[in-house]
Design a protein with these regions (language model features):
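Extended hydrophobic secondary-structure segments that form protein cores and membrane-embedded regions
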Residues: 149-157, 222-229
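Surface-exposed loop/turn segments flanking beta-strands in extracellular/periplasmic regions
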Residues: 82-113, 167-190, 233-264
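Extracellular loop and loop/strand-boundary signature of outer-membrane beta-barrel proteins
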Residues: 33-38, 51, 118-124, 136-138, ...
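Extended, hydrophobic alpha-helical segments in both membrane/secreted and soluble proteins
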Residues: 48-50, 151, 206, 271
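Alpha-helical support elements that line or immediately flank enzyme active sites
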Residues: 134, 138-139, 155
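Long hydrophobic segments that form regular secondary structure
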Residues: 14-15, 137-145
């Protein structure tokens, strides 16, 4: 575990306009490194936001907002639970590294946390993309005092791309001889294997609202009537290959045709 890990955050924003038109633009980036030494963990995020407000007339105003964000997560192929479990149960008589530099033996199941926390075992990379848009219109009805109509539409798009590449790795054990020779042992999977997943999600939200507020002498009348419609759908596609001849080519078409799997699903809901 590292004593500290760097983090960064930066953003730039611009706003301005006039009485009838206002705008706000923002670009941002932030991220942090993992807590393991030579860590395969990392998180980066990049985003863009824009808000526009316009007063079209004395009775109509329009606002539009959009947000685009990408989240990039990088993980080792072993889970944090597995890594910390091995770290907690490590034996003081088993070295993390031999004096000659080779990685020490595992506790069991190939778990040597100084190796499984790095990209020596492969990687698990996940990218999430968000696009969120909202358009809103307010209309004050001039011939009906106190009546305002509001309509809004939201369109959201989400993509997720995951690529997980597991590859064999070597740990070294003492052969028990007086010459203190360490011998390699293959751990992990016998051959590299690749999992890829793609998720595509779309969401619509439409709403209409009529709001009436008016004071008559000592009495105030307020009535609100609205309706809303929503639709969501998602498509998922996944594929798996193994028996790669080399761990240098992490592409699906380089995997073997034996024991391959493909899968997919979709769903839709509305209200």
């Amino acid at each position: 575990i590292k004593p500290s890990s760097p983090m960064y955050r930066s953003d730039v924003g611009v706003n301005g306009g006039s009485d009838k038109f206002k705008y706000y633009l923002n670009l941002a980036a932030n991220g942090e490194d993992g807590i393991y030494k030579n860590s395969a963990n990392r998180y980066d995020q990049y985003s863009m936001r824009a808000n526009l407000d316009a007063k079209v007339s004395n009775y109509v105003d329009i606002s539009f907002g959009t947000l685009a964000r990408m989240e990039y997560r990088q993980y080792p192929t072993k889970s944090a639970g597995s890594i910390f479990s091995a770290l907690r149960r490590s034996k003081p008589t088993l070295p993390a590294f031999w004096p000659s530099g080779e990685a020490g033996p595992d506790i069991e199941y190939g778990d040597n946390p100084v190796v499984t926390g790095t990209d020596a075992t492969g990687y698990d990379r996940q990218k999430d993309y968000y696009i969120q848009n909202t358009l809103k219109v307010n209309v004050d009805i001039p011939w009906v005092q106190g009546l305002r109509l509001t309509g809004s539409a939201s369109y959201d798009k989400y993509f997720k791309m995951r690529k997980k590449f597991d590859k064999p790795y070597y740990l070294y054990s003492w052969d028990g001889g007086d010459d203190h020779v360490v011998v390699p042992g293959k751990r992990g999977y016998a051959t590299p294997q690749l999992t890829q997943e793609h998720t595509d999600q779309t969401a619509w939200l439409l709403s209409a609202l009529a709001d009436y507020n008016r004071t008559f002498g000592d009495h105030t009348v307020g009535v609100t009537v609205g309706m809303e419609a929503e639709e969501k759908q998602q498509d998922f596609l996944g594929a798996f290959r193994k028996y790669f001849l080399s761990d240098k080519i992490d592409e699906m078409n380089a995997g073997g045709m034996t024991d391959l799997t493909n899968n997919g699903s979709s769903w839709k809901e509305r209200r």
